[in-house]
Regions:
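A structural signal for multi-pass alpha-helical bundles of membrane permease subunits
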Residues: 16-303
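Short, Lys/Arg-rich, polar N-terminal cytosolic tail immediately upstream
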Residues: 1-13
Length: 303
C-alpha cells in the first residue's frame, strides 16, 4: 500500500513533465521507425552491390565512384536544379494572386474558388490534364497556336522543352498552395500598421515592401520550405507525363533512383541507395538552414 502511495505521489509530482512525453512518444517512435531507420538503412545498403533478393556484396564507395562518371546522374542533378530555380516562381505568383483575392471586388468568391481548385487536385490528375493540354495534335496548347498562325510544338516529345513543360504543370498546384498561405497571412496583417503607413504617405509598392511583406514573413518562410522540398522530391509528374523520357532527359534524382533500384532497368538496390543518399544530403543542407532560421527567429523573439 505504501509503495502504491509513493508511486502515485511520484506521478503526481511529475505529471507536468510526463504528460507531454506521453503524447510525444508515439510520434517519436513512428518517426524513428519510418524515417530515421530507412535513412540509416539507405546509407548501409549504398555500400553494397545487391539486387534486393540474393546475397549482398560489400563494395565500399564503389557506387558513389560510379555516380561521378554517370551521365544520367549528371542530367538528373541538372534537372533538379532547374526544378529548384523555376519552382520558386510559385512564391511570387502565389503572393500576387493572394493580394488580388484579398480585395473587396464583385465575384471575389468565384475567383477564390477558381484559384483554389488546383490545390485540391492530386498530382496524378494534374499530370494527366497537362499531358492532354500538351498533345501534339489534339491538345489545347497547339489548338491555340494554330489559331494564331503558329506552328505546333511537341512539348513533351522535345528533349529541350519537356522538363520545362513538366515544371509548368507542377507550378499550377504549387502556386495555389502558396496563394493559400499568403491569404492566411494577409488575414493576420495588422490593419493599424497599414493605416499608419497610409498616413505617412506609403502606398503601392512601398506599402507592400515596408509594411505588408514583413508581416508575411512566416508565410514566406513556410512557402520557401515546402516549395524547395517539393522541387527536390519531384517524381509523380515526371512518371505520369514522360516516364523520364524523351531519351532520359526529364529524369530527376528521385526518378533515377527509382529506375535503378526498383524498375526493370536495374534492381540495383545499392546504386539506387547511393542516389538516395546524395538526394538526402542535398535536402539536408536546406533543412538545416531552415531549422537554424527557425531557431534564430525564436531566440530573437524571446529577447
Amino acid at each position: 500500500m505504501s509503495t502504491l502511495v509513493t508511486q502515485r505521489s511520484w506521478i503526481q509530482r511529475n505529471r507536468m513533465t510526463l504528460t507531454p512525453l506521453l503524447f510525444l512518444t508515439p510520434g517519436v517512435l513512428f518517426f524513428v521507425v519510418y524515417v530515421i531507420s530507412p535513412i540509416i538503412q539507405s546509407f548501409n545498403i549504398s555500400l553494397y552491390d545487391w539486387d534486393g533478393m540474393g546475397q549482398a556484396t560489400y563494395v565500399g564507395l564503389a557506387n558513389y565512384e560510379e555516380l561521378l562518371d554517370d551521365r544520367a546522374f549528371e542530367i538528373s542533378i541538372w534537372n533538379n536544379l532547374k526544378w529548384l530555380a523555376l519552382y520558386l516562381l510559385a512564391i511570387p505568383l502565389g503572393l500576387m494572386i493572394a493580394l488580388f483575392l484579398n480585395q473587396n471586388v464583385v465575384g471575389i468568391r468565384i475567383y477564390k474558388s477558381l484559384f483554389f481548385f488546383p490545390f485540391v487536385l492530386s498530382q496524378v490528375v494534374v499530370g494527366l490534364v497537362f499531358s492532354w493540354f500538351y498533345l501534339p495534335r489534339e491538345g489545347l496548347l497547339n489548338a491555340v497556336l494554330t489559331f494564331f498562325g503558329f506552328d505546333t510544338i511537341n512539348v513533351l516529345g522535345d528533349p529541350s522543352m519537356a522538363t520545362y513543360g513538366i515544371i509548368a504543370a507542377g507550378l499550377w498546384p504549387q502556386t495555389a498552395y502558396c496563394m493559400i498561405l499568403y491569404l492566411t497571412g494577409l488575414n493576420a496583417v495588422d490593419p493599424e500598421q497599414i493605416e499608419a503607413g497610409r498616413l505617412d504617405g506609403a502606398k503601392g509598392v512601398r506599402m507592400l515592401w515596408h509594411i505588408i511583406l514583413p508581416q508575411l514573413r512566416p508565410a514566406t518562410f513556410i512557402a520557401f520550405v515546402v516549395t524547395i522540398i517539393g522541387a527536390l522530391r519531384s517524381f509523380d509528374l515526371i512518371s505520369i507525363m514522360t516516364n523520364g523520357g524523351p531519351f532520359g532527359q526529364t529524369r530527376v534524382l528521385s526518378f533515377y533512383m527509382f529506375e535503378k533500384a526498383l524498375s526493370e532497368y536495374g534492381f540495383r538496390m545499392g546504386y539506387g541507395s547511393a542516389i538516395a543518399v546524395v538526394l538526402f544530403l542535398i535536402m539536408l543542407v536546406f533543412i538545416a538552414y531552415f531549422l537554424w532560421s527557425m531557431y534564430r527567429d525564436e531566440r530573437e523573439a524571446r529577447r
